[in-house]
Amino acid sequence: MSSAIPTSSVNPVKGMRKNGKNWHDSKKPFRPTSGLTSYEKRLEARKRQEAVKEHERELREEKEAERKAQIQKIKDRRAAKEEKERYEKMAEKMHRKRVERLKRREKRNKLLHS
């Protein structure tokens, strides 16, 4: 007796729909949490996002530092030009040696107070 029961891969009949519209697909229950990612995937995505933000922060800080260095360079250049003009004005009124002496004294005082 080697007879097997024939099995077919036919979908079982669901029965008639209540409203009679059997040509429509039957609706499935709405489960919004079923498509969510696993905890490990969320952690990995969060780590990637934090790494990107950290990199962006570093780039912003680097750009800001360059900008401040440029501003400081301009300020130093202006101060040096101003000081040079001031000494030239003093040289018009006074002797050259006295101007040089005042220059040295101001430089000493600047170093002491800085």
From Swiss-Prot:
Cell location: Nucleus, Nucleolus
Keywords on record: Coiled coil, Nucleus, Ribosome biogenesis, rRNA processing
Main location: nucleus
Domain of life (superkingdom): Eukaryota
CC per GO annotation: nucleolus
UniProt entry tagged with the keyword Glycosyltransferase: no
Region spans: Disordered: 1-114
Annotated Basic residues bias: 94-114
Stored InterPro entries: Cgr1-like (IPR005579)
Biased composition (Basic and acidic residues): 39-93
Function per UniProt: Involved in nucleolar integrity and required for processing of the pre-rRNA for the 60S ribosome subunit.
Family as reported in the entry's similarity comment: Belongs to the CGR1 family.
Name this protein carries in UniProt: rRNA-processing protein cgrA
Record gene name: cgrA
